[in-house]
Amino acid sequence: MIDKKLLLQDFEMVALSLKKRNHAMDDGLERLREVITHYKKQLIELEGLQAFQNKVSKEFGIKMAQKADTSDLKKELESNKIKLNELSKSVSELEQQIDLKLSIIPNLVDEKTPLGANEEDNIEIKKILTPRVFNFKPKEHFELAQQNGWIDFESGVKLAKSRFSVIRGFGAKIYRALIYLMLDFNEKNGFEIIYTPALVNEKMLFGTGQLPKFKEDVFKIENENLYLIPTAEVTLTNLYNDTIISVENLPIKMTAHTPCFRSEAGSAGKDTRGMIRQHQFDKVELVAITHPKESDAMQECMLESASEILRALELPHRFVQLCSGDLGFSASNTIDIEVWLPGQNCYREISSVSNTRDFQARRAKIRFKENQKNQLAHTLNGSSLAVGRTMVALMENHQQADGSIHIPKALEKYL
């Protein structure tokens, strides 16, 4: 959540940031500024009434002790109390109204994020490893998976519906091996391995920004205040929800393997075959909580950790800087890692590493104490990596002419 003070102190900057994102609010932002201004005035008035009430209460106590006449003071206290209660209710309602409006405004765009309308305006930063030249036409992963008996798409539909899969046999062993390899690499790079619930309450999804704006994208448990997590970013970040961290304990670096659940609202017709876009998938996530001065360096650290895994698996990939129009809701700056898929003859996203600055920390009340002062931390998140998409890339890049799959040396010890 952005700081409401910014709307009063630097309204034009906030408006420009939303314009960069193509986030239309019409005159809603101006109205919100007016509401915040009115709220501030009422808050000052409320504080004045509270101070007056305290002052008169003390006078009342002194006169009572002296057994003096207190009838006038009593009337004054009762009259002021009515005003105080009415104004307190008004201030509380305004605060709720402001917080609701602020909760659906996306993060401010980082100055390092280039201006652009959509993914077409994203900028390639660098390529790592050269794509292999095949002497045969490479197949797509779903063809290879079915040929080798690794993935049963029909059973996934039977058990649930479309966009679910069953992984079995040697394919399941590879899938498990990838998870272990990812966790080991992340742990080596200083990230603590954590296992968390796959269900969270509404407050946690608000903290990381999925709610209230993206309610259609998550699965809710009927008659419960519980949701299936769309990513371990939610659980790892919110481990420190409403927490004050000693500055000596920063940075906090965490990694988790979890199932992830997404409704994929708005994805009809996209990636209908295979494992690229599923309602349920596994992901190994990285989350970091840092001092504001250290978040840029942490983003580079997280990118390197994810890239190291891809290099170990001999998978060509590239870094792509997302433009302002393609940023996620909570992100201030995002760099994607896209892996080469020869079967599709293109690069596809396998990781997004985002710096949210203090946006999530303000929503989730994640603070740190430095020099006896509480400050908002910075939070970052990124995949390291999406397991299904890594398996897709492994099959397509390491396929042989007969349809068999070469296993990279780094993965052998996990099989």
UniProtKB/Swiss-Prot annotation:
SUPFAM superfamilies reported for this sequence: Class II aaRS and biotin synthetases (SSF55681), tRNA-binding arm (SSF46589)
Pfam families given in the database record: Seryl_tRNA_N, tRNA-synt_2b
Location of this chain's protein in the cell: Cytoplasm
Alphabetized InterPro entries for the sequence: aa-tRNA-synt_IIb (IPR002314), aa-tRNA-synth_II (IPR006195), aa-tRNA-synth_II/BPL/LPL (IPR045864), Ser-tRNA-ligase_type_1 (IPR002317), Ser-tRNA-synth_1_N (IPR015866), SerRS_1_N_sf (IPR042103), SerRS_core (IPR033729), tRNA-bd_arm (IPR010978)
Metabolic or biological pathway, per its Swiss-Prot or TrEMBL entry: Aminoacyl-tRNA biosynthesis; selenocysteinyl-tRNA(Sec) biosynthesis; L-seryl-tRNA(Sec) from L-serine and tRNA(Sec): step 1/1
Record carries keyword Metal-binding: no
Any single GO BP term: selenocysteine biosynthetic process
Disulfide links within the chain: none
Molecular function GO terms recorded: ATP binding; serine-tRNA ligase activity
Residues involved in L-serine binding: T231, A232, E233, E285, S383
EC class: ligase
Enzyme Commission designation: 6.1.1.11
Any single GO CC term annotated in Swiss-Prot or TrEMBL for this entry: cytoplasm
Keyword field: Aminoacyl-tRNA synthetase, ATP-binding, Cytoplasm, Ligase, Nucleotide-binding, Protein biosynthesis
UniProt cross-references to CDD domains, sorted A to Z: SerRS_core
Keyword set includes Aminoacyl-tRNA synthetase: yes
Annotated binding of ATP, by residue: R262, S263, E264, E349, I350, S351, S352
UniProt catalytic activity: tRNA(Ser) + L-serine + ATP = L-seryl-tRNA(Ser) + AMP + diphosphate + H(+); tRNA(Sec) + L-serine + ATP = L-seryl-tRNA(Sec) + AMP + diphosphate + H(+)
The family this protein is said to belong to: Belongs to the class-II aminoacyl-tRNA synthetase family. Type-1 seryl-tRNA synthetase subfamily.
Comment field on protein domains: Consists of two distinct domains, a catalytic core and a N-terminal extension that is involved in tRNA binding.
Name under which the protein is recorded: Serine--tRNA ligase
